[in-house]
Amino acid sequence: MSEQTIAVIGAMEQEIALLRARMEEVQTLSFGSFTACAGRYAGKRMVLALSGIGKVNAAVATAWVVHQFNPDCVINTGSAGGLGKGLKVGDVVIGDKAAHHDVDVTAFGYEWGQVPRLPAVFDADERLVGAAEQAAHVFEGASVRRGLIASGDQFVHSSGRVAEIRSRFPDIQAVEMEAAAIAQTCTQLGVPFVVIRAVSDSADEKADVSFDEFLKNAAVHSAEMVLKMMERL
């Protein structure tokens, strides 16, 4: 049986630093402005990529990682604005679904957020979601829930924008800037994926201050969840 390769993608250095520190036998590779570390964790081959912020960066990085390393699955890690009821800074959302909240081709009969010829919502792999839920049982310091994560090329920081997004995605738990692009790329390339995000802010008028203050805490919680999940895959 071949060795399992797990790719983990984060947008910011703060979101992947802990993961890289836990890896063994690390080698660094680059592709244009993108970098990835290949190493080992928990008896598995691990590829850790820094995508940069935004959906285009995330899609390019994901396509490169899949082409270069042929991973068995992709995990997206990082921070997010918490939109789910009761979510607090530091809480973790297992993204079992991902969608674009800023795509509008409704004039041609598509659903809001739907890219033509693709699903309106991208479903995460149930085995990966299950491993994340198992990891949640031993995760300490924050609550964990599963649900929809929506992405757009904007940092959401107003209650008005939050209300608009919620009106289109009533079941949304979190909002950020990369997950849907990673999910779409994985779907198109036939690679199982899951999203793990920790809440750094509430996506309201204080989001910029909260994000700067709590990013490190959110990044650590998301990374710890990924590590516990990898131990169970």
What are these regions (language model features)?
Residues 2-69:
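N-terminal short beta-loop-beta anion/metal-coordinating cradle
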Residues 83-169:
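Mid-sequence, gly/pro-rich, charge-dense loop/helix-turn segments that line enzyme active sites
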Residues 154-202:
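A C-terminal functional module that forms or caps the active site or interfaces directly
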